[in-house]
Amino acid sequence: MDEVRLRRLVERLQARARPPLPTELVPFHVAGTHVGDAQPAIARFVAERVAGFVLNHGVFAMHDGSLDIEARTSLLAEAATELRSAGLVTGWRDEQLSVGNPPLANIERAACRAFGITTEAVHLNAYADRETLIVARRAAHKQFDPGLWDNLVGGMVAAGESLRQALAREALEEAGLQLDRVEVQRGRSFQMRRPVPEGLQSEIIHVYDAAIPDALTLKNQDGEVDAIDRRTLAEIIAAIQNGELTLESALVTLESVTRRAGIDDLPAFYFDYETSSIHAI
């Protein structure tokens, strides 16, 4: 595969994943730690309606000096509920994600982007053979990127989960795949930080590869996928260029392809999570 072509494709998608951010974003602090960035309107709304939040000198913060993780979680739940009632948070999931690393609190998944809180996700490149990937098409009812192609497995790391636990859960839900039946290889990670209609998407995505034996039957279990298909790497690269994959899954796929091709010097984008300082913002 043409190395120059791959590099240019990664650079083009990287520009979409990490564009310049709006200068008016307000840093959001929990327990004195910068955990997110919110639009000024969101910061004002919460500070005016929920006791325990302040907006002062350009910093949006939880007034939480004496609070433990449960109390902070309760305050964030109150704020998220107020935002939901006002129509400023939609797509409620009743799923809790961690705030900060190590965790300082938990928050409803749907509210993360309103606060610009960094989330973590795991994605799996499923190889049928060295030149063929198994991919999944997102269901039409999905809130984000309906109908686009995706990695076979991909999803958020829930509060209290390890990366491996999240990957195993998502593999079972999305493909009926028992992770202990395949050999999983850890790839690199990357971070997306971009404005979205819901606020700010700040997400660290961890990449994994696995070879899927022909004997394994793959079937979606949670209704969030409407097709599973096999595509050659050449077909996948063409689909990425045509915008047929989600941005996240395109970058996940290219991480694997470039790594396997020995292209490991893509600066300031793909990184080794275990040795990196990029664990939050």
Residue ranges, per PLM feature:
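Surface-exposed, charge/polar-rich loops and edge strands
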Residues: 153
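NUDIX/MutT-family hydrolases
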Residues: 219-247
